[in-house]
Amino acid sequence: MRHKLIVFDVDGTLLDTSEGVLSSVKFAIKNMGYELPSDAVLKTFIGPPVQDSFSRVFGVMGDKKNRMADLFRIRYKNVDLLKAEPYEGIFDLFKALTDKGIAISIATYKRQDYAETIVKYFGFDKYTNIICGADFNGKLKKSDIIAEAVNLSGSSVGSAVMVGDTIQDNIGAGAVGMDFIAVTYGFGFKHRRDIDSIRGTNVIGIAYNPLDILSILERGKNEN
């Protein structure tokens, strides 16, 4: 296999974090006096920086946006962070990659302290100690986080591939010159139009379950 490093997103790629994230999102919305949006809209909060999602959905800016984000973070850190489930087959994938001598890094929009806590709690640190998350001010772009995950591994972007479930993962990988594998079992890329929108970019395959990722790496492309 030409890829020597696999960089994984967390939400919607390693873990189904929907229960915890949505619980904290709802807490922040209710405490600011807003009505809850539809379930479809709520699900769009999973993955991107939460302050950006509050701005997008409620039009809040400045202090109000920061207050909503603070409410979310306090609740998430103290109550909801570990309300998550590893996707079936993800540890089988990690073991197979490790057995083949392929390095693993993690790059997530989760804040750095949250990322370290949840990754270690579920045991992914058995396979990697490179866990790169967002800064406390939310200034880092996904491309910055991905680049850091590659740099810390000692690999090059040309020998690395990003695995994720959102367009932000796809764009972030492309911005640093990396290949990308899109997963459909998470929160993004649920519709054919979503997948079609990223074809012809840096995408080398579409994974419908975690073990599909290994097959894509072994053959170099997704035949579906």
Question: Over which residues does each language-model region extend?
Answer:
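Glycine-rich phosphate-binding loop signature in dinucleotide/nucleotide-binding domains
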Residues: 1, 99-102, 152-159, 220
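Acidic, Mg2+-coordinating phosphoryl-transfer loop and its flanking beta/alpha structural elements
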Residues: 162-205
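A structural signal for the hydrophobic beta-strands that form the central parallel beta-sheet
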Residues: 106, 133, 162-164
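Conserved H-loop
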Residues: 35, 125-129, 156, 204
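N-terminal helical cap/lid subdomain that shapes the substrate entry/recognition surface
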Residues: 2-92
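Substrate-recognition element of Asp-dependent hydrolases with the DxDx(T/V) motif
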Residues: 25, 90-119
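A short, structured active-site edge motif that brings together acidic residues
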Residues: 125-140
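Conserved Lys-Pro-Asp/Glu-containing loop-to-beta segment of HAD-superfamily phosphomonoesterases
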Residues: 5, 142-172
